[in-house]
UniProtKB/Swiss-Prot annotation:
It comes from Pongo abelii. Pfam families: MFS_5 (PF05631). One of its GO terms (biological process) is monoatomic ion transport. It is a multi-pass membrane protein. GO terms for cellular component: plasma membrane. Keywords: Cell membrane, Ion transport, Membrane, Transmembrane, Transmembrane helix, Transport. The gene is MFSD5. It comes from the Eukaryota. It is found in: Cell membrane. The chain crosses the membrane at residues 1-21, 43-63, 79-99, 128-148, 174-194, 195-215, 249-269, 278-298, 311-331, 344-364, 376-396, 409-429. The keyword Transcription does not apply. This is Molybdate-anion transporter. GO terms for molecular function: molybdate ion transmembrane transporter activity. InterPro entries: MFS_trans_sf (IPR036259), MOT2/MFSD5 (IPR008509). The keyword Membrane applies.
Length: 450
């Protein structure tokens, strides 16, 4: 398993580099890329945002392993994960309103403080302290995915008066480097935890200086901005009306809830499946992120002028890949007949599918959901998503260890079959909808500049 993980990592990394280099050579520079003021504003945003993302990714490979290192049972670990998910959904519902009221910069600084405290709780073996840490982690995650982007959009439009058409270029580049940071963070986590031998708590301690630096840079370089005009109840009510009045939105939300709840369960299960077979967790995690990056690169190529595939087709392909991978996992995790290499390949396919899924879903959401209702609709999407994930982990908590993992993959397979049916339903509804298609080869390319 050790050799397989390193070979997969090197192979995936080489594939990603090859695709990105060929794409960069073929793409001419855009007008936004040559604007010094725009590039400076991007740099001010990236230097804080990327530190926050790096600190977040650094903790991912060894979270389950740390709880296992503290001799907690799998059921107890499942409850810790459920606590984190419940915290994320509760704080996520009010995060946008909280950020608007508190201030975007202040919220980013609060993120660095709460996430640092979350990391410090990992030094304790007390179960209650770890539960508090998971709650802080949920708050931090909600702030990470709301405050930073809200701050940048306000600065981009209100302070610098840049064209709104340039905003996707900033976030497309951020998405690419987010994958790169995740790959590097996995290797760094493996280095401090395993190669140096500091143990599974080391990545969490190493994340604290990154969070402190992110908070300090935000305090020094960022201006504050507020938006006190949105009421939480009005936002949610508008989102619910949009969800119930448009069948496309309802089907899209169903697909997102089913697909992403399965991904949350996968995040919990990959460590106990591979760790007993000597897998280097940091390198395995980096391989996952490289596979996801490869999927994103394939998405950009597939939707380019040359191939002109539609996001709806790629969304369907992503769901099919995950269905196939989960069926693989139901066999490769059979008690007494475990095949870690097959499980690892299935996990890589799931991550590849994620690389196709997220940009496809982002494109379709942007086209289907009115901009003024997106925050409210996404709040309603998150509720079933996290509830399904929590229910899955609670079912696993009550299962026998030897058969529980296989049974959970079987349940996830059934969930993804339902997601596939929802995709077919969405296809039926939007098959003649030109709005959900990328521009034709004779028009400007859809993909934002990187």
């Amino acid at each position: 398993m050790l050799v397989t993980a390193y070979l997969a990592f090197v192979g995936l990394l080489a594939s990603c580099l090859g695709l990105e280099l060929s794409r960069c050579r073929a793409k001419p520079p855009g007008r936004a890329c040559s604007n010094p003021s725009f590039l400076r504003s991007q740099l001010d945003f990236y230097q804080v945002y990327f530190l926050a993302l790096a600190a977040d990714w650094l903790q991912a490979p060894y979270l389950y392993k740390l709880y296992q290192h503290y001799y907690f049972l799998e059921g107890q670990i499942a409850i810790l994960y459920v606590c984190g998910l419940a915290s994320t959904v509760l704080f996520g519902l009010v995060a946008s309103s909280l950020v608007d009221w508190l201030g975007r910069k202040n919220s980013c600084v609060l993120f660095s403080l709460t996430y640092s405290l979350c990391c410090l709780t990992k030094l304790s073996q007390d179960y209650f302290v770890l539960l508090v840490g998971r709650a802080l982690g949920g708050l931090s995650t909600a702030l990470l995915f709301s405050a930073f982007e809200a701050w940048y959009i306000h600065e981009h439009v209100e302070r610098h008066d840049f064209p709104t058409e340039w905003i996707p270029a900033t976030f497309a580049r951020a998405a690419f480097w987010n994958h790169v940071l995740a790959v590097v963070a996995g290797v760094a986590a493996e280095a401090v935890a395993s190669w140096i031998g500091l143990g599974p708590v080391a990545p969490f301690v190493a994340a604290i200086p990154l969070l402190a630096l992110a908070g300090a840079l935000a305090l020094r370089n960022w201006g504050e901005n507020y938006d006190r005009q949105r009421a939480f109840s009005r936002t949610c009510a508008g989102g619910l009306r949009c969800l119930l009045s448009d069948r496309r939105v309802l089907l899209l939300g169903t697909i997102q809830a089913l697909f992403e709840s399965v991904i949350f369960i996968f995040v919990f299960l990959w460590t106990p499946v591979l760790d007993p077979h000597g897998a280097p967790l940091g390198i395995v995690f980096s391989s996952f992120m490289a596979a996801s990056l490869l999927g994103s690169s394939l998405y950009r190529i597939a939707t380019s002028k040359r191939y002109h595939l539609q996001p709806m087709h790629l969304l369907s392909l992503a769901v099919l890949i995950v269905v196939f991978s989960l069926f693989m996992l139901t066999f490769s995790t059979s008690p007494g007949q475990e095949s870690p290499v097959e499980s690892f390949i299935a996990f890589l396919l799931i991550e590849l599918a994620c690389g196709l899924y997220f940009p496809s879903m982002s494109f379709l959401r942007r086209k289907v959901i009115p901009e003024t209702e997106q925050a409210g609709v996404l709040n309603w999407f998150r509720v079933p998503l996290h509830l399904l994930a929590c229910l899955g982990l609670l079912v696993l908590h009550d299962s026998d260890r030897k058969t529980g993992t296989r049974n959970m993959f079987s349940i996830c397979s059934a969930v993804m079959v339902m997601a596939l049916l929802a995709v077919v339903g969405l296809f039926t509804v939007v098959r003649h909808d030109a709005e959900l298609r990328v521009p034709s080869p004779t028009e400007e390319p859809y993909a934002p500049e990187l």
